[in-house]
Amino acid sequence: MSGVILGRYWGGLSQLIYVIIGAAGVPWFADMSGGPEVLLGATGGYLLGFILAALLLGHFVDRHIRARKFTPMLGLMTIANFGLIYIPGLVVLGLWSLKTQGTLPGPWELLVMGLLPFIPGDILKITGAAALTRAITPKEPYGEEIDIQKAEGWRVP
């Protein structure tokens, strides 16, 4: 949601600051953990994915007025979540497993550890966030949109 609310630059920067401050030791990651070992641990890839997802969602909200509607945002958030957050997350989780256990987990084992348990909750959160997008994003174009000519009929009375 940071990319949706803050836009492409500030949204991405907010997530970068979140990761940097957490890596500096502020315990606000999962299980109230912090420090550089978190970035080098099993969840480090997911944290880096947060930055990528904020940049992508912020770009589309800033540059494409139609992306601010529920259905396009639902698709974008699904891509950001399962592509930009989970792919680096699963890669780092696999490398972390290799480092700590000496074996690289197979693809299915990796999905069972780092993706499948979270799908139901993620779908619920993505749906809620996409629904909120329509309410919190500008209803009028503000000049930077590529598809500004499609803004007619956008404003809800």
Swiss-Prot record:
Listed transmembrane segments: 10-30, 38-58, 76-96, 104-124
Family: Belongs to the BioY family.
Localization of this protein: Cell membrane
GO molecular function terms listed in the Swiss-Prot or TrEMBL record: biotin transmembrane transporter activity
Top-level taxonomic group: Archaea
Function: Probable biotin transporter.
Record flagged with keyword Transmembrane: yes
Keyword vocabulary terms for this entry: Cell membrane, Membrane, Transmembrane, Transmembrane helix, Transport
Membrane topology reported for the UniProt record: Multi-pass membrane protein
GO cellular component: a single term: plasma membrane
Protein's UniProt keywords contain Transmembrane: yes
Lineage, highest ranks first: Archaea, Methanobacteriati, Methanobacteriota, Methanomada group, Methanobacteria
Record-linked Pfam families: BioY (PF02632)
Protein name (record): Probable biotin transporter BioY
